[in-house]
A protein has these predicted regions:
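Phosphate-binding site recognition
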Residues: 1-142
Length: 142
């Protein structure tokens, strides 16, 4: 329980100080509660939260990442597919098990630079490094 409180307080610090400039990555072993903490944080600290679990994502969700040149369309498609409304500067988008879908990892810098929403990623660091070794990352790791 103490671990979860510590992570949650670090996420609050990230939200307050860095979420407009950086995504955050929660990394760790499988089944330690990363997804649960991420979802709880999104539900409690933001007006809305979209969780994309790449271990279960539909083909339609994955297709959203095929062309992110037009972010207006990208965000409209995400909202349509999830049924969740995004609010600028008040919504969190969670990429869960991000190591399973490198296109999302590639897109994160572009999405953060857009500045409309906050981004939290979860995954196994070993798997992330293996699957995205050629992608430049600009994400603090907690």
């Amino acid at each position: 329980m103490n671990f979860k409180r510590k992570v949650y307080s670090r996420l609050l610090e990230w939200k307050e100080k860095y979420s407009d400039k950086y995504a955050v990555l929660l990394e760790g072993a499988r089944r330690v509660g990363k997804s649960t903490i991420a979802q709880s944080f999104g539900e409690n600290e933001y007006d809305s939260c979209i969780l994309i679990d790449f271990s279960k994502a539909t083909a339609n969700i994955l297709e959203c990442f095929d062309d992110i040149a037009n972010l207006n369309i990208f965000f409209l498609r995400l909202q349509a597919e999830t049924g969740i409304t995004l609010y600028e500067h008040k919504s969190l988008i969670i990429f869960d098990e991000v190591q399973l879908f490198p296109k999302a990892r590639q897109a994160i810098k572009h999405l953060v630079a857009d500045g409309r929403y906050s981004y939290l990623e979860t995954g196994s660091l070993i798997s992330i490094k293996k699957n995205v070794k050629d992608i430049l990352l600009d994400t603090p790791i907690f």
